[in-house]
């Protein structure tokens, strides 16, 4: 199986999981930056992005230190934490592969760094693909 490695890391004023919007797009004023690893922070890798308004980010729940790995049901807070749902029916960070998917709005691109609005990512979150 192919190993995936981060191509970038997200920079955000949110340094803990508390206060992070429950999904992307809910905090229109929250600005963050996608800072690429040096081998990807090149003009040719970003060419054409200026024609788009939004990006999909595939990222990892890197701060999830729970021992709940492998559980297939979770108690979502939106249901008061009283009902169990299958992990695939929720936005729970306790996922089999620990991957997240978010849509963000491009604000601007400067020197190989993409500034975005509306992300639900914590500072330092690894980004695996755009």
Identify the residue ranges that each predicted region occupies.
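Glycine-rich, low-complexity intrinsically disordered segments
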Residues: 1-103, 107-130
């Amino acid at each position: 199986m192919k190993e995936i490695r981060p191509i970038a890391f997200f920079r955000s004023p949110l340094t803990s999981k508390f206060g992070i919007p429950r999904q992307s797009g809910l905090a229109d004023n929250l600005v963050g930056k996608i800072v690429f690893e040096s081998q990807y922070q090149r003009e040719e890798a970003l060419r054409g992005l200026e024609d788009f308004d939004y990006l999909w980010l595939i990222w990892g729940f890197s701060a999830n230190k729970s021992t709940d790995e492998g559980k297939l049901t979770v108690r979502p807070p939106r249901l008061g934490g009283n009902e169990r749902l299958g992990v695939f029916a929720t936005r729970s960070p306790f996922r089999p592969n620990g991957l997240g998917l978010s849509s963000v709005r491009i604000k601007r691109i400067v020197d190989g760094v993409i500034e975005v609005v509306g992300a639900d990512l914590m500072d330092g979150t690894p980004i695996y693909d755009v």
